[in-house]
């Protein structure tokens, strides 16, 4: 993941919170139970938390309220500016992404929501291998994102979006890198993690991977 999505992130920054509230009918199901998804990620995290894709700070705020120490990473300047308005003044957000970031001294949990699909499957593997080196035994990765049980589930979801006239959603599903559960299970296990997948709406699953 380089800078190819930064323009999209900057453009989306000022409307992102309306998206997650379900105001765009095409993405209403993608963000169904949004607050519950964030809470689930928070509840599965512990200790010092490295968050990728801070966005407008929604997950970050919940992590801080839960008493976590958070190190935030966000590539978009516009997103960082909006998040800083919502978060405590002393909280700093570092420019970076899933593959290129300043490494904090000690991390217990790595979290992200609605962002890991910006990486190709090969890049996902590189990222998870890197995180495996950062985490001690018992450390965790907790990612919530749109993924699919298998190819058939993906194909049916794309076709359903087209049938409903949700052409922007269908295009999104076909142009970004939404992966399959077997792919992610292999990536995690090959890098020394035990992983479980929990579905929280039609699109989003929470991946909870524990370093062995």
From Swiss-Prot:
<dbReference type="InterPro" id="IPR029063">
    <property type="entry name" value="SAM-dependent_MTases_sf"/>
</dbReference>
<dbReference type="InterPro" id="IPR023553">
    <property type="entry name" value="Uncharacterised_MeTfrase_YrrT"/>
</dbReference>
<comment type="function">
    <text>Could be a S-adenosyl-L-methionine-dependent methyltransferase.</text>
</comment>
<dbReference type="GO" id="GO:0032259">
    <property type="term" value="P:methylation"/>
</dbReference>
<feature type="binding site">
    <location>
        <position position="97"/>
    </location>
    <ligand>
        <name>S-adenosyl-L-methionine</name>
    </ligand>
</feature>
<dbReference type="InterPro" id="IPR041698">
    <property type="entry name" value="Methyltransf_25"/>
</dbReference>
<dbReference type="Pfam" id="PF13649">
    <property type="entry name" value="Methyltransf_25"/>
</dbReference>
<keyword id="KW-0808">Transferase</keyword>
<protein>
    <recommendedName>
        <fullName>Uncharacterized methyltransferase BA_4603/GBAA_4603/BAS4271</fullName>
        <ecNumber>2.1.1.-</ecNumber>
    </recommendedName>
</protein>
<feature type="binding site">
    <location>
        <position position="74"/>
    </location>
    <ligand>
        <name>S-adenosyl-L-methionine</name>
    </ligand>
</feature>
<dbReference type="GO" id="GO:0008757">
    <property type="term" value="F:S-adenosylmethionine-dependent methyltransferase activity"/>
</dbReference>
<keyword id="KW-0949">S-adenosyl-L-methionine</keyword>
<feature type="binding site">
    <location>
        <position position="53"/>
    </location>
    <ligand>
        <name>S-adenosyl-L-methionine</name>
    </ligand>
</feature>
<comment type="similarity">
    <text>Belongs to the methyltransferase superfamily. YrrT family.</text>
</comment>
<keyword id="KW-0489">Methyltransferase</keyword>
């Amino acid at each position: 993941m380089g800078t190819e999505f930064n323009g999209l992130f900057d453009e989306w920054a000022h409307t992102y919170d309306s998206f997650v509230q379900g105001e765009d009918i095409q993405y209403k199901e993608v963000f169904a139970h949004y607050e519950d998804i964030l809470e689930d990620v928070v509840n599965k995290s512990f200790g010092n938390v490295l968050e990728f894709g801070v966005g407008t700070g929604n997950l970050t705020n919940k992590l801080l309220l839960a008493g976590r120490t958070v190190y935030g990473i966000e590539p978009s300047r516009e997103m960082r500016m909006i998040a800083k308005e919502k978060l405590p003044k002393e909280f700093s957000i570092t420019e970076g992404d899933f593959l290129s970031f300043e490494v904090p001294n000690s991390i217990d949990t790595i979290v992200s929501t609605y962002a890991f699909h910006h990486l190709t499957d090969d890049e996902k593997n590189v990222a998870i291998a890197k995180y495996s080196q950062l985490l001690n035994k018992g450390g965790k990765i907790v990612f919530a994102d749109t993924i699919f049980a298998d190819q058939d589930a993906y194909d049916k979801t794309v076709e359903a979006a087209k049938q409903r006239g949700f052409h922007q959603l269908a295009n999104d599903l076909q142009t970004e890198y939404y992966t399959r559960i077997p792919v992610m299970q292999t990536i995690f296990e090959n890098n020394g993690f035990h992983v479980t997948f929990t579905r929280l709406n039609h699109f989003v699953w929470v991946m909870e991977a524990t370093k062995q």
